[in-house]
Amino acid sequence: MDEVHSILNNVFKLKSFRANQLEAVLATLLNKDVFVLMPTGGGKSLCYQLPALVKSGATKGTTVVISPLISLMQDQVQHLLAKNIKAGMFSSKGGNDDNKHTIHLFREGFLDIVYLSPERANKSNAMQTIMTKLYNNNQLARVVI
């Protein structure tokens, strides 16, 4: 619990959780399935971004986020990188975000959070192989949809 509040304060620069966020964070850290329904701007992202940084929970490894909105993924990754959080993304468009270095970091479990478009998660053999490897090595912390 101390680590959770430390990350909230020191990494995300927030003093407190919004309604239901702490419960969602603690549940995912206990490796429970979590369903979070909040309005836009309600704080859903923190419910998976913060646990991705906690090293003392039951879940360790990379958090994979499936998102259909490329611009949202780009914004989230930039926001996380600005906080020195190891994050990357792979979209259906490929291109610059698909560089070999980011793929290597994902494959080796060095990223805290990876955003994937549904198309990349579903149709890319490489992404499915990486996720399977991480899962088999207990390095896949959670999948967020």
Predicted regions, residues:
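Conserved motor-coupling elements within RecA-like helicase/translocase cores
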Residues: 99-114
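Conserved helicase motor
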Residues: 90-100, 118-123
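Conserved pre-motif I regulatory segment
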Residues: 1-39
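Alpha-helical scaffold elements adjacent to nucleotide-binding pockets in ATP/GTP-utilizing enzyme cores
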Residues: 75-80, 101-102, 130, 144
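Short hydrophobic/charged patches on amphipathic alpha-helices used for structural packing
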Residues: 25-26, 100-103, 128, 132
